């Protein structure tokens, strides 16, 4: 039922579920582990390039497929089914990182690309289900609730994973490397378990009659061609998407590459992990507060403010030389990052035809 507490919470818990991947894998352990365990080169610049290439390949593939699979989902009323498919693609690939042995960077980056595709593609359909659980006046609050739960949920599991890494023997684990590999398994389990509420309690409204997958593909392709032919009629949407593609790619780059960047300039793993935990636990309340801020000055003005603030902080990040600088940046990043993500999702849901 739309606007029911149960459906809104069930939808929001998917953020809690998949943010474990964003935190423990994408932002936390994978960049460091890839550089120090899987990579076979002593050249830190080259390992950073491999990691950036993996992120770029995943992003390009998702960007290329998104309009087509989105159109198929619209015509076949299959957003939820496609969300589940891509979520479990990501879950299986994340769990697969457990089997990758030291030095096998090619297999590690392959699993990472597949998991990232599952994560990002799943989010396309997760975002598209927002109107199924909330009306327009509740978009900002519901979207912000999802991201805030994502930060606290991802942060909690990451904290457990960090403790496993720092004190492996306390958990019955032989060493830190095994602890990190087990962390990837824990992310897969966390992602799967906390996806269950959405699977059970979020009902996708039936917009079109159910059709076969082949009919959905045909109708989806026709819809995509039709939309592209009328692109000039959707100037607001196109303008927003172009801007969003640019600024959110910057946000995603910071999330994915910050730890690798800090490691490359000589910061200790413990300092980088501490900074990442700071982001998670500061962003949890900050995202909710930013939602209230948006109601005061308007969603677009709040989004402009967040983007400008985030940009200035990122510029300062280029001049970081001490570890305490990294902590300061982490706190300020946390103040704006969740707001950018949540309000962008809410605004896009409002303006799509």
Predicted regions and their residues:
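C-terminal membrane-cytosol helix-exit motif in multi-pass small-molecule transporters
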Residues: 157-170, 188-208
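Helix-to-loop junctions at the C-terminal end of transmembrane segments
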Residues: 64-78, 285-299
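Structural signature of the two symmetry-related core transmembrane helices
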Residues: 81-96, 301-316
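Helix-loop boundary and gating motifs at the non-cytosolic
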Residues: 2-59, 106, 236-275
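Juxtamembrane intracellular "pre-TM" segments in multi-pass secondary transporters
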Residues: 2-9, 203-241
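Intracellular juxtamembrane helix-capping segments at the cytosolic ends
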Residues: 121-135, 339-353
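Helix-loop junctions at membrane interfaces in 12-TM secondary transporters
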Residues: 98-111, 318-330
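Glycine-rich segments within core transmembrane alpha-helices of 12-TM secondary carriers
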Residues: 143-165
């Amino acid at each position: 039922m739309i606007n029911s507490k149960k459906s809104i919470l069930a939808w929001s818990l998917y953020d809690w579920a998949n943010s474990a991947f964003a935190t423990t894998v994408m932002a936390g352990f994978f960049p460091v582990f890839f550089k120090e365990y899987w990579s076979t080169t002593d050249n830190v610049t080259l390992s950073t390039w491999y990691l950036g290439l993996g992120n770029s390949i995943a992003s390009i593939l998702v960007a290329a497929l998104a309009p087509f699979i989105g159109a198929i989902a619209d015509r076949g009323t299959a957003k939820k089914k496609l969300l589940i498919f891509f979520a479990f693609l990501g879950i299986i690939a994340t769990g697969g990182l457990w089997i990758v042995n030291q030095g096998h960077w090619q297999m590690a980056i392959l699993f990472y690309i597949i998991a990232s595709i599952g994560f990002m593609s799943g989010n396309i359909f997760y975002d598209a289900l927002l109107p199924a659980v909330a009306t327009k006046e509740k978009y900002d609050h519901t979207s912000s609730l999802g991201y805030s739960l994502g930060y606290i949920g991802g942060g909690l599991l990451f904290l457990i994973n960090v403790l496993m890494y720092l004190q492996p023997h306390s958990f019955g684990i032989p060493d830190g490397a095994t602890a990190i590999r087990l962390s990837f398994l824990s992310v897969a389990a966390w992602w799967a378990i906390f996806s269950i509420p959405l699977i059970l309690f979020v009902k996708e409204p039936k917009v079109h009659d159910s059709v076969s997958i082949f009919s959905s593909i045909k109708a989806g392709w026709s819809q995509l061609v039709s939309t592209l032919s009328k692109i000039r009629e959707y100037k607001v949407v196109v303008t927003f998407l172009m801007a969003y593609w640019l600024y959110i790619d910057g946000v995603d780059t910071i999330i994915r590459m910050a730890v690798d960047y800090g490691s490359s300039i000589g910061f200790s793993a413990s300092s980088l992990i501490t900074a990442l935990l700071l982001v998670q636990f500061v962003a949890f309340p900050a995202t909710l507060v930013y939602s209230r801020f948006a109601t005061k000055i308007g969603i677009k003005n709040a989004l402009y403010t967040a983007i400008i603030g985030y940009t200035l902080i990122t510029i300062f990040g280029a001049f970081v030389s001490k570890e305490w600088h990294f902590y300061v940046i982490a706190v300020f990043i946390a103040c704006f990052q969740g707001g950018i993500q949540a309000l962008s999702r809410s605004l896009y849901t409002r303006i799509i035809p």
